[in-house]
């Protein structure tokens, strides 16, 4: 395997023309089936070294059995989130991460790296966190893996982004709705195959409010009315529009099904899985005053109670994959 990277050379091909050959001294081969595997080994080494140098400098949590948990990194390929419960700890974690990456010749993109404080105030704290001497920009929201994460832990901005994305892709194929030779079945397939996945990307993790659910359903009705060729001046009821299109389940109901699918998946995990342990754990510290924000489990509770069962009963059902799948697909009276 090592021989693949000794005296490696490459060129750039554009059409039928090729550039001069040049030496490749860093990085992995583009398109090689081994590259993802090799990168995982490499980044795992970085993570382990940083963790060893920053013990006890993550976000403290208490597990279901009372054990101490420290969460200091979220990883997906080369997208990394470093976490700490104080500015001093975050400085240390980021500093050590930068040193380890530099020693292993992995470049940290300072321009794309941001700092964010998570609290109810959702305001900037003027943090001074640096990588290789360069100060990182502080923001009150940022996009991670396609979703918007905000400092106050609200989901509204992410939902609005998905609504905007759904309307954008719907508008891109809007001319197709006027094609008379395209049947409603074909239009419905396009809507469900393009618009719905865009609007509900990442919805499994949402804890939505009534307002957020209304945004999704309003966007959907705009799309369905356009597919039918009717507008509000025609005074056609939403129920009739849905009957014509052949879609009875609302977008918010589809979102509930995705949330329940993910809930069942987590409940079936082994108790020693990190995801399950974090799911069962509680963050250290006291709750701040005021009305608590809509939590993810609140959405789960709402969805299962609409189907006529309690959360405790739903937890029992989740362990049988086939039974849970049928339960998730069950149409409530609101969606029937």
Set out the residue ranges of the language-model regions.
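C-terminal anion-handling pockets and recognition modules
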Residues: 316
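Residue-level signal for short amphipathic helical patches enriched in basic/charged
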Residues: 269
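Eukaryote-specific, cytoplasm-facing alpha-helical/coiled-coil scaffolding segments in long proteins
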Residues: 222, 290, 326-329
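C-terminal helix/juxtamembrane-tail motif
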Residues: 322-336
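Nucleotidyl polymerases of mobile genetic elements and RNA viruses
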Residues: 1-250, 254-257, 273, 280, ...
